[in-house]
Amino acid sequence: MASTRRPFGPPRSGFDLRDMFLDSSRMEEIRNLQARSLGQVTPGQSRILKRNQTMDEKYLMPKEEAMAGRGVSLGLRPPTISSKTRASEALRKLAQIETKILNRKQVPMAWSDVESDSTSIEQSLPKRTGAASVSSQYPHRTFQKQVNKTCVSKSDGPSGNGSRFLKKKELPTEARSPGLAVGTGKQALLPTKKESASDEEEEMLLLRSLMESSREKEANRNQELPGSSVSRSNLGKVFLDPTPDQPGVLSLLSVDQSSLKSPRPIQSTRVGLRTHSRQASSAGDTVSITASPPILDDFSKSASSKMGCIKLASSPSRTELESSEEPVSEAAADSLHDFRINILSIDDLVLADGDKSDGDQREEDCVREGISVRSSSPTSPTRLEAQMWPKNCVFQGTATVVGDGEGLTTESDVSEPPGTSSSAAVQSHSMSRALTASPAYSEDFEQFSGPLALEESLDRTLDTLSKFSSSGQTDIVARQPLSRTEWGRGVTRVVKETAVQTLDPAFAYQWSKAGGIAAVGPALGGAYVDPAPIASHIVSADAIEALTAYSPAVLALNDMLKQQLSLTQQFIEASHQLHGSLLQSLDGDSFHYHTLEEAKEYIRCHRPAPLTMEAALQEVREELQVPASEACLGTCPPRNQ
């Protein structure tokens, strides 16, 4: 399955809008080749076989193989059965779907609105297939008629075979894709809710496979033509292959690159494409669901589908052609919904006094150029042109500011996005500038002190506000004469200026202004010297030393040291008194501590005498006599002595 090829450069993705407009002779050759290749289609094989072969040729075919000065024809493999089978199957199934839709309309229905639906479908379908019905001008389209006839004859049988391409369930209106609903604006208004979106998706898939197969056959047929200048790169440019996930991303990228290089020619190309897509959409659906096999029809329909995707991406904004025909008021009103952030420096905001006329001229030019740019969406290519505006292309409004009551006027530029300037924003901005520029608040403290200064400042502020409001409103009305919205209307505001004037700081000690004078003079008065000095013009050195050697700080420090010394003395005296009282309390105590000598002396003095034998016998006798007498008392008879 591998093919030999030599790439001349990196493959390019997407297509260029300028490459779609080929010569009429090339288109005739491509049409003849397509008719010849479609006439040799042999049905009977499965269209799923060898799918990766077409994908390899689709993504690996370099666009730069056919250069400007080279007539090299590369060796390509012959057309396979799978490409022919896919073309035949695509045509046959597309015709089957259309015939099933036509047969479904012929079923008798009870409601009148269903009959009106069927009549509207019958009116819309011949318009869609009108390009395929003109077979007298293009004789190679007879093959399509034959395929349609065979498909009709096959579908006239039992209806069970044809129901496999029609979905049983109908998607609700909200569940359909929004992009398809917007793209088919004219048919969405018609009551064709019976047709499901799945049929249209199947038709789109079949058309895409048909375009892939035709591209492969045209690339294979190129080497058989001896003098053909049509190469595979041109064919890649002609056949637009929208992917199902992102239908308009490639086209938008190419439009952005081309608009960066040359914005003016792309504008003409865009206008031409828009007129072409308008003709295609008037002939039928914008999605271009048709069964005509020639390359010119595929090219036109696919181009219209691409432009339909671009329309979907840029909705609900208008393009340059339509927006240039609208009045200035509608463009300004629509631009209120298109917010932009303009970050300008101080140099952009400052305008010289002599450039006022030039600024007005540039303002009118910017208004003319901004009409076509502001109406486009951020995803459209004109967004890049809007970002490349010159810095001086802004609305420059002059605001008069009166300063110091001398009639000196200055101009301040109010820079805002085009179409979004409101009188309230400009008025509030210039009011703040007028209040900050007025020096009455800062200079009236010492010059004016009283109610007269307040009245003069209020009058000056009111005059400034009146002059500014008159000039600012006239500029805004001249800039936006036909504004349809009430958001930017001028609002009258009364600003009152209030000021607080304070007195001198009330300190306890007032320093004399003549404190720096060393000599005794009349400034010191009679507080320090004799009122009638003997020699007032002669000052002795002792007097100067006495006046300058001591300062109030030194005197205060001396007094503080004296007080600290007296406090220290009092603390020492109190400590002595406490110690003396403690000693007195200890000396007057009656308790006496005994020493060892005193204890021995006491024992010696109080020791008893030693006991002798006689004393011991005497004590024994005394002890024996006493108990015996006590025991015999009253029991024994008295003894006779």
Swiss-Prot record:
Q: Where are the transmembrane segments?
A: none
| Biased amino acid composition, Low complexity | 374-383, 421-430
Keywords from UniProt, A to Z, are: Phosphoprotein
Bias (Polar residues) occurs at 132-162, 222-234, 278-289
Record has Phosphoprotein as a keyword: yes
A family per Pfam? DUF4614
InterPro entries of this UniProt entry? C19orf44-like, DUF4614
Here the segments flagged for biased composition (Basic and acidic residues) are 355-368
- Carrying Phosphoserine, the residues are 112, 198
Region feature (Disordered)? 118-243, 261-289, 355-386, 404-430
Entry protein name: Uncharacterized protein C19orf44 homolog
Report the source organism: Mus musculus
